[in-house]
Design a protein with these regions (language model features):
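Outer-envelope beta-barrel architecture signal
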Residues: 23-27, 68-72, 103, 116-122, ...
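Outer-membrane beta-barrel transmembrane domain signature
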Residues: 111-203, 223-225
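Extracellular/periplasm-exposed beta-strand and loop segments of Gram-negative cell-envelope proteins
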Residues: 37-53, 80-102, 131-167, 198-212, ...
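Start-of-domain marker
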Residues: 25-71
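Outer-membrane beta-barrel "beta-signal"
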Residues: 110, 211-225
């Protein structure tokens, strides 16, 4: 019994030592573009149409590789999310183009597979974010008959009763990594952010939930310690 226990302990120690020997840190930067749309129940807004908008996505990455196939990854990213909305019918001419700037922090598990130089990977986890600032452009048709559209070009004016600036959700991605040197690697990734918090609070009798849905295409360079 004692011999069996000793063998088990030795096996555990060997596994820990092997994992520690293979483990390594890496740090890097990423840059890309993001397309955002709103998941929204328009309800009474029958004459409004919503479309996606593109923005920037860039940030810093830290990753700890436990093995050659499993790692934990944390990021701090600047993510631009936007959308446009316009009216149809008699109110055609009214249009707003929003751009919202977020600071987001994804925390993900990363699973990789493939050869020594060229590898595929899948990331998945959660994120938290904060709505830093925004802008709105477009035009407002004041009267249905005269056809005059008043231009709009200004910073977004936050309203604490209406706007929910904290954001939380799920994030996942798939990509390819190429390691061209002992300590250097490059990645390309397609990523999806799914928000579970509305950008608007429940401040009206009729619920007006609006949820960001963001697809990001990005490339990054990493230094492996």
């Amino acid at each position: 019994m004692q011999k069996t226990s000793k063998k088990c302990m030795m096996l555990i120690v060997c596994l820990i030592a092997t994992t520690a020997a293979m483990a390594q840190w890496r740090a890097g930067v990423t840059v890309g573009a993001a397309s955002n749309s709103l998941d929204i129940d328009k309800q009474y807004q029958y004459d409004w149409r919503y479309n996606n908008r593109w923005g920037m996505d860039f940030g810093a990455v830290g990753q700890y590789d436990f093995t050659d196939w499993f790692a934990v990854r944390a990021e701090l990213n600047y993510l631009q999310r936007g959308y446009s909305q316009h009216r149809t019918g008699m109110n055609a001419g009214t249009e707003y183009k929003y751009r919202h700037n977020y600071l987001v922090m994804p925390l993900m598990a990363s699973f990789s597979f493939g050869g020594e130089k060229l590898r595929g990977f899948v990331n998945g986890g959660i994120y938290g974010g904060y709505w830093l600032s925004g802008s709105v452009k477009g035009g407002f048709k004041e009267h249905e008959d005269d056809g005059i559209v008043l231009p709009i070009d200004q910073d977004y004016d936050f309203n604490s009763t209406r706007d929910n600036r904290w954001d939380f959700g799920y994030v996942g991605g798939i990509g390819v990594e190429y390691r061209w040197a002992a300590h250097w690697a490059a990645q390309v990734e397609a990523r999806y952010y799914y928000s579970v918090t509305s950008i608007t609070k429940d401040y009206m009798l009729i619920k007006d939930g609006r949820y960001n849905s963001t697809v990001s295409l990005q490339a990054g360079v990493f230094y492996i310690f």
